[in-house]
From Swiss-Prot:
EF-1 is composed of 4 subunits: alpha, beta, delta, and gamma. Interacts with actin. Belongs to the EF-1-beta/EF-1-delta family. InterPro entries: eEF-1beta-like_sf, EF-1_beta_acid_region_euk, EF1B_bsu/dsu, EF1B_bsu/dsu_GNE, Glutathione-S-Trfase_C_sf, Transl_elong_EF1B/ribsomal_bS6, Transl_elong_EF1B_B/D_CS. The lineage of its organism: Eukaryota, Amoebozoa, Evosea, Eumycetozoa, Dictyostelia. Its main location: cytoplasm. GO terms for cellular component: cell cortex; cytoplasm; cytosol; eukaryotic translation elongation factor 1 complex; phagocytic vesicle. PROSITE patterns: EF1BD_2 (PS00825). It is found in: Cytoplasm. Disulfide bonds: none annotated. Keywords: Cytoplasm, Elongation factor, Protein biosynthesis. It comes from Dictyostelium discoideum (Social amoeba). EF-1-beta and EF-1-delta stimulate the exchange of GDP bound to EF-1-alpha to GTP. This is Elongation factor 1-beta.
Amino acid sequence: MPSFADLTTENGLVELNKFVSDKTYIVGFVPSSADVQAFNLVKTAPCATKYPHAARWFNTIASYSAAEQGQFEKVTETVTIAAPAAPKADDDVDLFGSDDEDDEEYERQLEERRKKAMEHKKPKETVIAKSSILLDVKPWDDETDMVELEKCVRSIEMDGLVWGASKLVAVGYGIKKLVINLVVEDLKVSTDELEEKIKDFEDYVQSVDVAAFNKI
């Protein structure tokens, strides 16, 4: 189950931002009760500059009304808030400290200044625009080998393309479609080109549709 520090604190938002960096929702491929729980724990929209992934996720959930959120898929996974570290006992506090501790603190501060000075000298890193995409890949019929179909899809390699989780979803009459998540670098991967590559496996694939698309 997802676990974070207090989501009203900077530590909690840092953890949430990292957690949803490659996800659209907290659990699975559709909004669920876990998203509502986390949304209520965050309370206010995260800063889009400091926490872009958390802000994108928060705004997605905020776009649904309370009534709509109540209709989200109910999941067994729940969001937990990790207990903060216990404060140091009073009788363990050294009110006067020691020379060794003073020296260590001085060295630590000196090292921090060195690191900050080096960071200013480093060229700024270019932000790489990425997108999280959910594809629906439909077979011709119920006799299509879905294991081979998925192998074919995952065999596609493109610079800037990373395949993620997948599952088979029933669509009726014994037919199942492949729902697969992927992350692409926008400047390197064309979704149209990717769809055409998947459709080239014409013995298995009838159609490819984008079910969800989110900038990350």
